[in-house]
Amino acid sequence: MAERRTYVEEVLAVLQYEFRPEQRATSERKLKRRLREKKLGPYDQAVIDAVRAFKYDVQAEIGYPVDSCFHTGSKGRFAAMDDWDVDGLRKHFRSRHPDVPGDEIDWFVPWAIYLYYLR
């Protein structure tokens, strides 16, 4: 049996594919339904907004690697996880987004590198 996701993990699972402001209403509907069906707690707009700000910040940092001080440069012909200072990114986002639990930041940063940079 798979581990049960936390509230913030479920929110990030929906928001990670929200790329345009027009998708916000769809994401909100999905979030309300998922949180209700999985009995993770009531919909909390303040938490959702904090996680959304974190997600957009991560996406912006990884989406423009040339401008990022955490992008260490390509070491080979292809993009790789080693092109990033993952620990530095984690520390940066932990200090910048204290409302988002540190454990959630720790797992999401490498996933975001895969999702927004490697794919």
Language-model regions: role of each:
Residues 1-119:
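Charged, amphipathic alpha-helical regulatory modules used
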